[in-house]
A protein has these predicted regions:
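Pol beta-like nucleotidyltransferase catalytic core
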Residues: 1-156, 163-182, 186-190, 195-289
Length: 289
């Protein structure tokens, strides 16, 4: 319409399937790196705390601020498997109107994946469940509500993107691998052992950056599963298995890996965030030549 040349623009985004999601072939484009600067000064004050060795009252933390089908299905399955009573969880979507819409819409949008899913009416027609503002993205970036991390043993991170496949050859070079990883993942990474309901190869990418993951808690083979439903089932199985453990059993595992949490905090803390921005700027300038 405006006779603009696409080569006059460089789109910076975290969507590794961007070229498949738009009619226009957006090329070239760059990827936003993990560890953006937003909210970092507020996170720093909560780092490097000694393990208080207290018995926590909840097993895991799972925050769900906005609607995505995989979040609805996971919460639904956690409810039917009695996993939510001993957790801090939230869903900013619910009520009878939402239930009537979602039970149809999920199968329309993702029929090939969730065709057999039946939402539990008693759970979804209830009130939305919030964690004192922890699900508001602006509040969360300014204040991670550390109390929920301090009183639970691991995080279930429900990432924004889930129904995606990332070819293995894209995860060989670090740290510029095009994966959709948001503040949800690095929030969990900073304070907890964590499992991610997100894109395949997320853990592989994080390990490539130097972070430690937690096979002591989870069967992390789920990270390599490209089939969406199979990856989902593997994540769900992990959570159900851990939920069957007592708080005392989880504490024993948690205490044994606490040094890993501190290590991840140190690595994240020591990143040169100004360099992340300057490197991205240099790549943009290089593409304009």
């Amino acid at each position: 319409k405006y006779d603009m040349d696409k080569n006059d623009f460089i789109l910076v985004d975290g969507n590794h399937n961007l070229s498949h999601n738009f009619v226009v072939d957006w090329d070239p484009y760059l990827y936003r790196p993990l560890g953006d600067k937003i909210g970092w000064e507020y996170y720093k004050k909560f780092l490097f705390q000694e393990n208080d060795n207290k018995l926590k009252t909840k097993k895991f933390l799972c925050m769900n601020g906005s609607f995505h089908p995989h979040r609805v299905v996971l919460l639904n399955d956690l409810y039917t498997n009695n996993c939510l009573e001993d957790s801090y969880y939230s869903n900013n979507f619910g009520g009878e109107k939402f239930y009537n819409w979602a039970k149809v819409q999920i199968k329309i949008d993702w029929n090939e994946i969730w065709e057999d899913v039946e939402l539990e009416k008693d759970f979804w027609i209830g009130n939305k469940k919030k964690l004192d503002g922890a699900d508001d993205i602006n509040q969360r970036l300014l204040n991670p509500h550390i109390k929920y991390f301090e009183d639970s043993y691991f995080s279930v991170v429900t990432e924004t993107w889930f129904n995606n496949k990332t070819p293995d050859d894209l995860v060989k070079e670090y740290p510029n691998t095009p994966l959709k990883i948001t503040e949800k993942t690095y929030g969990g990474l900073l304070f907890h052992p964590f499992i991610v309901l997100g894109c395949p190869y997320t853990l592989k990418y994080l390990r490539g950056l130097g972070f430690k993951t937690f096979p002591e808690f989870f069967d992390e083979s789920y990270d390599m599963i490209e089939d969406v439903r199979e990856r989902y089932e593997a994540v769900l199985e992990n959570i159900i298995r851990l939920n069957k453990k007592s708080l005392e059993e989880l504490k024993e595992i948690y205490d044994s890996v606490y040094d890993k949490i501190l290590y991840n905090q140190r690595l994240f803390h020591d990143w040169d965030r100004d360099k992340l921005v300057s490197d991205l700027y240099e790549k943009i300038m290089e593409k304009t030549k």
